[in-house]
């Protein structure tokens, strides 16, 4: 009775109507962004000759649990270089349902998740993975000083298959701090696509600094190219939205990827205005048995 009376008030009806309008507008904008992203990818495939090169990774992008098509590119990298222990490590896993390794977990891989925000733990609880050895986790803020210690304490193998770093501000410094302590076969790194491909640039290091929402973050693709070369890795591609770069350890590159392995050759500009979940709402996928 009181509820019906409450909702009959003109001001409440107007608020409900406005909320419904806002929800419809948000849905329309999201759908429009998703359509734009699809059209962009289709347009690039038909107009950019790089997509015709089978050694490039751009044409293999698809989105299962990732944000920018990383799932497909990662699958293609390991189709070319093979897998060994099927172990991943990712820093910056977000909410636990949309990141670079959630899809691998559903395909039978095991690994390690670390993030400063504990929200991803809720997803692990829902999926029954909190006590599982398949996915170990830690809530921690990664920096240059603690990265090696955290990976060592978690028991991450030195030669895991995949390392993914997406910690916004200090990613360049953290990858550099790993040195020879860990030698993943492939690496996914967030880069700053606002900086042109030929310019070497990175933010000043401060362990307590966090991303302020501007384009003053991380490092340019050229800076990562040079860091990767120093660590023994080759830049083999970027995702179409200019968010992540992909590196493969030099001893595994062979003739599998498009040379030269430079930022000028593989750079994609930031297209963040087109990043949107394509399709149904995201969720952790059921885990398949390892073949």
List PLM regions with ranges.
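Hydrophobic packing residues within well-ordered alpha-helices of enzyme cores
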Residues: 124, 151, 174-178, 247
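Rossmann-like AdoMet/SAM-dependent catalytic core
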Residues: 27-82, 89, 97, 103, ...
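A structural signal for short, well-ordered beta-strand segments and their strand-loop junctions
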Residues: 90, 113, 164, 186-190, ...
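SAM cofactor-binding core of SAM-dependent methyltransferases
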Residues: 58-153, 157-165, 193-196
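A short alpha/beta connector and helix-capping loop motif
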Residues: 134-136, 173-210
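Acidic, low-complexity intrinsically disordered segments
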Residues: 1-24
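Active-site glycine- and acidic-residue-rich loops that bind
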Residues: 164-174
